[in-house]
């Protein structure tokens, strides 16, 4: 790797890396987004404070968890959709809190925010898998399949491997129904 050449320093920053060994040219548009995806790269103290609030919720009653998680969410710089982390961490924690307590409308609101930042980070299969599980458990099978399919296309079977097998079985069966293998008769 010979290094990075900065071609433009405004918001439309383009950086080019040239890998001489493999003769690849890789360009990144909006390179600042690579850093903005993770608050820790920009403001590690704030990231740590948010992490501490989320950790503090462990084994607390519902109302205390809710208060701490919403406090953590308010600390995330606006717009929250620019940060893969900690937005995903906090919104998934709020989603799970409401979901476990059968407050499905609130759970859905927080899941929606988590999904809005899912593609900012390097790994997003877990967020999509949670969305699939949520909709499956609410018997909204079309939405469940949609999110399971995104998770599968992103990470294969692995995210399903740590969940109840019914989700994988549902996904596989629906996928086979929607994409039947063509059999030719001779």
PLM region spans:
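Boundary/linker segments of alpha-helical solenoid repeat arrays
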Residues: 80-83, 120-126, 153-166
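Residue-level signature for tetratricopeptide repeat
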Residues: 55-59, 97, 134
